[in-house]
């Protein structure tokens, strides 16, 4: 009965948010600026170490699973790697000045675990410590606040070789030791910590479908992967990530928070899902899709356990929190980071034939999520095949978080769109990115409405990304940056039109 009441409650919540989505959309076209947002609202750009730094063998850095994966033939769309990336390791001062020129308040970047501990554990690489001290100090000297991510997918290869990394609970202690060194060495200046970036993505892409490092899966009769278990490993990885986050949070709160005055959160990848129809089964399917995405990680951190839909559908394959673990996990964050790019339709998957064939975690939700209904797409497409432009989804998602999780502090830790990188597109034409300007204008308008009209507790917004960069399995085929990086001319940075738009936006208080 309790389970049925919960389903009814969540169904009503999905219906309410869907109705809000259909409300007056005039805010989407409203003129906005920094002054449209609350005083103290943070604007910044985001990056990750592996996608931006390059210098993979410089000054004692150890190899990561993404070094291995990107050098494996056929894994990257354009057969590239991130050995150089956009060379931010050497050009950080130039890039910090670009942020300053725009009027950005903050920079979200990640620390490479193997620059601090080349083998994941053991001796500390002081050259790595020195590099991040220089970056943090350079940011602060320009009035830019560092928001530091401790893990953005670049697991030390040594730990994967030794005990399969996130599949082994040993990683909890090893990551905690790494995190504590970061708190000790950087915490006097870093006031916002993010433990993990998109655990849902690296659990699914790395351990279910095998399209990202470390490339483990059993779908399609192991045609694309040599080892793994797509029906169990994603849940084991997710469980160990949640326990690791909670352990690190406990350490920070007990030993560093009072002295350093910082806060600690985690960043999730979150699509919004609209029911494909007003049928109850599709509304419930949209809720399940969200349970198996955001709820998988945020429910334990807020409530101490996984969503009931996951418990009932995954069964014994879903790990169980002990009583003490549940207490440790519950409430172990100060803010929620949301990486939001797009919205899909969701419908009930009554037959689940594909799920029966694949027998993997993706199919467990019993939903089909697609960016089109019939012959119509949900919005215009960016360059990436998965990224459709649906600004209203931002407002709907913020309201969902408000109502389900009690309106916690939220930072939009990533939002952006890409253009294709093609030799047929001249640099002159690539700088004319009106589509990106409209994307950010409309998503920011939707976000502003969620704050001003709906009372959502959103504290900041980070653009992905300052620079074009190496986009994981897509390599250099995709350009997300506000600045164009010329890969054929010494990685020179050129401002796109969106830089000028953001500069005007950030320097206007009207």
UniProtKB/Swiss-Prot annotation:
It holds the Pfam family Glyco_hydro_1. It is an enzyme of class 3 (hydrolase). One of its GO terms (biological process) is carbohydrate metabolic process. The active site is at residues 198, 414. Residues 1-29 form the signal peptide. It catalyses: Hydrolysis of terminal, non-reducing beta-D-glucosyl residues with release of beta-D-glucose. Glycans are attached at residues 229, 278, 349, 507. GO terms for molecular function: beta-glucosidase activity. GO terms for cellular component: apoplast. A beta-D-glucoside binds at residues 51, 152, 197-198, 341, 414, 464, 471-472, 480. Its EC number is 3.2.1.21. Disulfide bonds join 217-225. PROSITE patterns: GLYCOSYL_HYDROL_F1_2 (PS00653). Belongs to the glycosyl hydrolase 1 family. This is Beta-glucosidase 40. The gene is BGLU40.
């Amino acid at each position: 009965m309790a389970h049925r009441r919960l389903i009814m409650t969540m169904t009503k919540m999905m219906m309410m948010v869907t109705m809000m989505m259909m409300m007056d959309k005039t805010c989407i076209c409203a003129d906005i600026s920094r002054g449209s947002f609350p005083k103290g609202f943070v604007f910044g750009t985001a990056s990750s170490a592996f996608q931006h730094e390059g210098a993979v063998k410089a000054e004692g850095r150890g190899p990561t699973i993404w070094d291995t994966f990107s050098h494996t033939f056929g894994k990257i769309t354009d057969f590239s790697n991130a050995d150089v990336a956009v060379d931010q390791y050497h050009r950080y001062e130039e890039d910090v000045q670009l942020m300053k020129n725009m009027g950005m308040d903050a920079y979200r970047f990640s620390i490479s675990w193997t620059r601090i501990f080349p083998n994941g554990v053991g001796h500390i690489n002081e050259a790595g410590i020195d590099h991040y001290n220089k970056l943090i100090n350079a940011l602060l000297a320009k009035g830019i606040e560092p928001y530091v991510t401790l893990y953005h997918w670049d697991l030390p290869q040594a730990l994967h070789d030794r005990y399969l990394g996130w599949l082994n609970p040993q990683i909890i202690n090893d990551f905690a030791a790494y995190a504590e060194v970061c708190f000790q060495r950087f915490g006097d200046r870093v006031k916002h910590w993010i433990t993990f970036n998109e655990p849902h993505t690296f659990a699914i892409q790395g351990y279910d479908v095998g399209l990202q490092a470390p490339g483990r899966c059993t779908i399609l009769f192991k045609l694309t992967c040599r080892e793994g278990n797509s029906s169990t490993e994603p849940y084991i990885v997710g469980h160990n990530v949640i326990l690791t986050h909670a352990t690190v949070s406990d350490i920070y709160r007990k030993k560093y928070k009072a002295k350093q005055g910082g806060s600690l959160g985690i960043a999730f990848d979150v699509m919004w899902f609209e029911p494909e129809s007003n049928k109850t089964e599709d509304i419930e399917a949209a809720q399940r899709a969200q349970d198996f995405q955001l709820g998988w990680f945020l429910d334990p951190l807020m409530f101490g356990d996984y969503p009931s839909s996951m418990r009932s559908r995954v069964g014994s394959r879903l790990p169980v929190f002990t009583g003490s673990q549940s207490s440790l996990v519950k409430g172990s964050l100060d803010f929620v980071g949301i990486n939001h790019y797009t919205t899909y339709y969701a419908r009930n998957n009554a037959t689940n034939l594909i799920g029966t064939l694949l027998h993997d975690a993706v199919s467990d939700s019993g939903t089909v999520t697609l960016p089109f209904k019939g012959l119509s797409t949900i919005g215009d497409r960016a360059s990436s095949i998965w990224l459709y432009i649906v600004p209203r989804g931002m407002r709907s998602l913020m309201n969902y978080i408000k109502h389900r999780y009690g309106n916690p502090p939220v930072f939009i830790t990533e939002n952006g769109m890409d253009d294709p990188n093609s030799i047929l597109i001249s640099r002159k034409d690539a700088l004319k990115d009106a589509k990106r300007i409209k994307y950010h204008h409309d998503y920011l308008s939707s976000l502003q409405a969620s704050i001003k009209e709906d009372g959502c507790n959103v504290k900041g917004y980070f653009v992905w990304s300052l620079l074009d960069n190496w986009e994981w399995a897509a390599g250099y085929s995709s350009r997300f940056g506000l600045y164009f990086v010329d890969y054929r001319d010494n990685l020179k940075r050129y401002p796109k039109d969106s830089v000028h738009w953001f500069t005007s936006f950030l320097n206007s208080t009207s």
